[in-house]
Amino acid sequence: MAVINFDVKNISLFADGKSFGEHGQFNQIDGVVEFAVDPNNEVNKSIVDLKLAPTDENGLVHFKSKVSLITPSDTSKGNARLMVDIVNRGRPLIHGNFNRMDLFDSIEGDGFLFNHGYSVISLGWQWDVIEDDVLYGFEAPFAKIDETGFRGETVIEIRTNHVQKTHLLANRIHTPNTPMDINDPNARLTVRDWEDGPESNVPRSEWSFANETDSGVEPSDEYVYMESGFQPGKIYYLSYTPSIAPVVGTGMLAVRDIASFFKSDSNVNPINKPFEKVYGFGISQTGRMQRHILYLGLNLDESGKVAYDGHIVHVAGARKGEFNHRYAQPSQQSAPGFGHMFPFADEEMKDPYSDNVDGLFNELRKINAVPKVFYTNSSAEYWRGDNANMHIHPIEERDLPEAPEARIYLFSGTQHGAGTLAPDDVGPDGSVGMYKFNVVDYRPLLRASLINLDKWATDGTLPPPSSYPRINDGTAIKPEVLIEKVNNILDINTPDPKKVWLIRRVDMGERASEGIGRLPAKEFETYQNFVSNIDEDANETGGIRMPDLTCLLYTSPSPRDQRGS
């Protein structure tokens, strides 16, 4: 058993002791879970640098997660199901997406999950999250890297909403990825005007590893400085060799092993009663992490037991992410790299640009441990350039076969996050949209997905068939064709068709297969993209259409342009 301790920090009545129907009151158990894994066990072999991490006297590698478990006070009153909330950049998001907590200003919201008897555990897994009262942290082991030869590189993506001269060496406000040498002449800074645009180098003399302080500009291993300033609307990539090498992939082992722990008898389990089914929920970043976990086949624990019975992979698109390579930054998603690599679809196929034959479920099929999976996406993941590749051939105009264990759903006419009233044009990162944001609230569909997933995993009741843009029925269309159609219907500003994002084949060097990359990645041929077609009102026709689209009051545009970009 990989979980060796559950250090309970606090137990309290959840929601001030509110009772949730037949399931009664719930407890909230806050604590820290300690894991210890065998780096030589076959089920852990895919974790990059795990064998370079420190071990105890038994040869095991240790790491810890901050957790919070919400479960019925009387364990006999629950539904014997556990939802694992794979927190997004340290933040629990499951309650906002299933309990609609924003409408009630409380974590329990309208109580959907708890009224159905679900237990929920929120789990920290990301090495660079700075833990506090809100954020869930993770203590990862650090690998001892041979300082001779090529160690690998990382890349910091810099996008600003205003001119700034300094930027933290992290993706968002995380623990800085400090460089091994702040005077490294091989460190590189590049700039481009849009994601798929041409790239140019910024001369090394124009920037430095430094910070602007009250005493002036001073050398720093936590910041990058450029006198002319990083400009809004531009995309910068800074690559260098870091001084620290966290074993980032242990976060995925924590996600796997917390599930198997709660399905097994254990004397360190704070509720001392196994769950019958465990389902994972990830959104955006953590949805990509779920896809990466599936790809690596991480659904059997060290004793050979199945961890997850099902997953809801929400707004992840067709990518994976920076979750299992040396110097990875899990919050990074848009810079070309390991997360943009083939395969994109569940079933095995050949990469049209290489000899690689692979599928997301290949490793899981080898060990007979494929869980039930719901992929739920908004229109944004299609316009991002990658989502269609999970079900449409990447260079041929034909639909791909679906995996029998999965369902794929587009929530038509929606943006990345569920819409709310009243509409706004300022995003959580401070970016300003050209128009008010989409208000379609797709969360009822997430609730239905959970109910259907549970029935499927429990008694084999088949869920509704997949619903997404297809070539064979004309609901899938190239973005540039769609933009022209919109221009003929609506008098609005639309994206430049030449600047719509596409995923490209990437190359991180000769050791990329070991999880050790040269960055920024070299980019080559593009994989094509499709989006949903539209009707005469410019509303999407592919996927599941909410009443906002079928009982028409307005057009719900899916792409979101940012001012100044």
Question: Can you say where each PLM-predicted feature lies in the sequence?
Answer:
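Primarily recognizes the serine-hydrolase "nucleophile elbow" in alpha/beta-hydrolase
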Residues: 276-322
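Catalytic-loop region of hydrolases
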Residues: 1-240, 245, 298, 440
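Conserved small/polar residues in nucleotide/adenosyl-binding loops
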Residues: 554-561
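Extended catalytic-interface subdomain
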Residues: 320-420, 446-451, 455-456
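Long, C-terminal catalytic modules of enzymes
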Residues: 387-388, 400, 409, 414, ...
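Short, solvent-exposed loop/turn and secondary-structure capping segments
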Residues: 44-47, 93-99, 131-138, 267-268, ...
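Gly/Ser-rich "nucleophile elbow"/oxyanion-hole loop immediately N-terminal to the catalytic nucleophile
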Residues: 246, 260-279, 284
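Phosphate/oxyanion-binding active-site loops and adjacent basic polyanion-contact surfaces
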Residues: 59-63, 240-260, 289, 342-354, ...
